[in-house]
Amino acid sequence: AGXXXAHXXYKGPSVVKELVIXXXLGLXAG
């Protein structure tokens, strides 16, 4: 499911991609 979500984000707008990356980094840091 993670791969599919990442693929969808990759195809989406750059803004969405940035939000996804920020969320992932936040979870990793948290």
From Swiss-Prot:
Predominant location: mitochondrion
Subcellular localization(s) per the UniProt record: Mitochondrion inner membrane
Covalent S-S links between cysteines: none
Transmembrane regions: 15-30
Example of a GO cellular component annotation carried by this entry: mitochondrial inner membrane
Protein keywords: Membrane, Mitochondrion, Mitochondrion inner membrane, Transmembrane, Transmembrane helix
Protein family: Belongs to the cytochrome c oxidase subunit 5C family.
Protein task: This protein is one of the nuclear-coded polypeptide chains of cytochrome c oxidase, the terminal oxidase in mitochondrial electron transport.
Official protein name in the record: Cytochrome c oxidase subunit 5C
